[in-house]
């Protein structure tokens, strides 16, 4: 019975997207392929399969999105060792971000879609920039 519910749930529930504010310098690196990981202190729902990118400290617009290819979670040291080749962030900035944490999370960037015409938050019904992320459909 549980297996059936899980299977039914996966078929019938649309996958969600999450909107992440990401600094302009990191957005550029995601788009040019030099940043293959988006680091966070915790994951959003497993139902999310796409990250929508709000460029903070830049245009202040939604400029693209990427599919989540995988999720990694481990100690900050292990995540850094595994991802440093395409981190797109300095080692000191990485460890500063995760200071005092025993867990680091990383979204593996999959297919990237750069919007030809950037969108506003209002296009998604959002009036305030989320601090970490917000769910959208």
Per-region residue spans from a language model:
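Non-catalytic, usually N-terminal nucleic-acid engagement modules in DNA/RNA processing proteins
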Residues: 52
């Amino acid at each position: 019975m549980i297996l059936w519910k899980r299977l039914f749930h996966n078929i019938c529930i649309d996958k969600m997207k999450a909107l992440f504010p990401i600094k302009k310098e990191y957005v550029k690196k995601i788009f040019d392929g030099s940043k293959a990981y988006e680091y966070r202190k915790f994951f959003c729902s497993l139902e999310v399969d796409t990250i929508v990118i709000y460029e903070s400290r830049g245009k202040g617009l939604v400029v693209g999105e990427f599919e989540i290819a995988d999720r990694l979670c481990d100690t900050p040291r292990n995540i850094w060792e595994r991802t440093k080749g395409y981190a797109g962030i300095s080692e000191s900035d990485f460890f500063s971000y995760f200071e005092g944490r025993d867990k680091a999370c990383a979204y593996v960037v999959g297919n990237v879609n750069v919007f030809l015409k950037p969108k506003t938050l209002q296009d998604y019904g959002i009036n305030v920039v989320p601090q970490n992320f917000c769910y959208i459909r």
